[in-house]
Amino acid sequence: MSGKDVNVFEMAQSQVKNACDKLGMEPAVYELLKEPMRVIEVSIPVKMDDGSIKTFKGFRSQHNDAVGPTKGGIRFHQNVSRDEVKALSIWMTFKCSVTGIPYGGGKGGIIVDPSTLSQGELERLSRGYIDGIYKLIGEKVDVPAPDVNTNGQIMSWMVDEYNKLTGQSSIGVITGKPVEFGGSLGRTAATGFGVAVTAREAAAKLGIDMKKAKIAVQGIGNVGSYTVLNCEKLGGTVVAMAEWCKSEGSYAIYNENGLDGQAMLDYMKEHGNLLNFPGAKRISLEEFWASDVDIVIPAALENSITKEVAESIKAKLVCEAANGPTTPEADEVFAERGIVLTPDILTNAGGVTVSYFEWVQNLYGYYWSEEEVEQKEEIAMVKAFESIWKIKEEYNVTMREAAYMHSIKKVAEAMKLRGWY
C-alpha cells in the first residue's frame, strides 16, 4: 500500500482503538474518542490583487476538551483535507496528554498553496479564516498555533483580527507568535529540540552512542532544521538529508563525513533547495531511506514511510518528528524487525509543550528566559519518554502503543470524572 492510499483519519482511529483494546477500556471510551467533538468548515472569500474574488476552503477540528481547551496548529497547504485535520486533532489530544499539559486536541487548515499568494493576499486570507471561526476559539476554548507553511507573522495577523472582532486584548488566543508580540523565547526551536532530546534518550536505551551516531533526516523546514542543529549539538552526524522542491519533486543528498546543518540552512535560504549543496552527492529517495545510519528522522508530511520503505531501513531507531509519517503496515514491519520507533505524539511534543508555556506566560504576563524554557521543556520530554518506555517494557508493546496507552488512560479518567460515561 502506498502512502497516498492511506486515510490518515482511519489510521488515527485504528491507533486509538488498538490502545483502548490493549488497556481493556470500556467501549464508551473509544466511542467518545473516535470522532472530533466539533469540525468547522468555512468558505473564505479573498480579494485578490487583481481585484477578483477567490474563495478558499478552511477547516478547524476540535477533538476533545475533557482535560482543557483544545490546542493545535493551522496549516496552509494544497493537500489539506477535512479528514487530515480530524486525524491531526486526534493526535494532538494524545500529544498534549503525553507530556501532561492541560489541553485537548485541535487542528486547522486551509486548502491553498501559499507560494502563489502575495503578502497582501496571504494577510487577507489569514484574517478571513479567523472571521470564520472566531466565535468558536479563545484562550480558554481553543488555542491555534503555526503549522505547515504558517509562521509568527500569520499568527500575529490572526490575533489582531480576533481582538478586533471580539473587542478584547487577548494575545493568548494563539501561540507561536513573535517574541515582540507575546511569543515565548525558545518556541521557534522547541519542536526540533524536543526531537533531539527524544532521539538521545531512545539511543541511550538501545546502546547507540549519540556522539558517534549517523543520522538521516527527511525535511529541512522548521522542525527538520532545528532537529539537525540540536542533534549536532549532542554530537550526532547528519549524513543524509531528503527534501522536496517544485522542479525536482523529492530528492536526497548524502555525505558520509556529515552535512553541516547551518551551512545547509544558509544554502537553502539562498538557493531554495539543496540540489547542488557543496560536498554532497545526490542520491535517490530509496537510497536515502536505506542509507547506513543509526537513526532515521522523518520530519516532512504524513505517510512518508510505507511498508516498502520500512523494509529497506537499516537504522535501529526511527524518531517521528513529523505527524503521522509512518503507515500502519510500516509500523508492523518495524515491530517484526525489532526497530524501535518513537511516535509523533511523543517525539514532536516539544512544540506544543512550549506553546503551553507561551500561553501560561501570556495569561500571567510574566516571561521566562530562553534557558528556563529549554530546561522546562527538556524535563517534560524526558519524563514523558521514561513513562512511555516503562509501559513499553511492562506490557511488551511498541512505543506507539505505549504512548497511546499512557495518554488515553489520562484522558479517559478526565472524561469519567466529568460524567461523560
Swiss-Prot record:
Annotated family: Belongs to the Glu/Leu/Phe/Val dehydrogenases family.
User: What SMART domains does the entry give?
Assistant: ELFV_dehydrog
* Record-linked SUPFAM superfamilies: Aminoacid dehydrogenase-like, N-terminal domain, NAD(P)-binding Rossmann-fold domains
Assembly and partners are described as: Homohexamer.
Q: Where are the transmembrane segments?
A: none
CDD domains named in the record: NAD_bind_1_Glu_DH
Official protein name in the record: NAD-specific glutamate dehydrogenase
The enzyme class is oxidoreductase
Record's keyword terms, sorted: NAD, Oxidoreductase
Species lineage, top-down? Bacteria, Bacillati, Bacillota, Clostridia, Peptostreptococcales
Site keyed Important for catalysis: positions: D147
BP terms from Gene Ontology: amino acid metabolic process; glutamate catabolic process
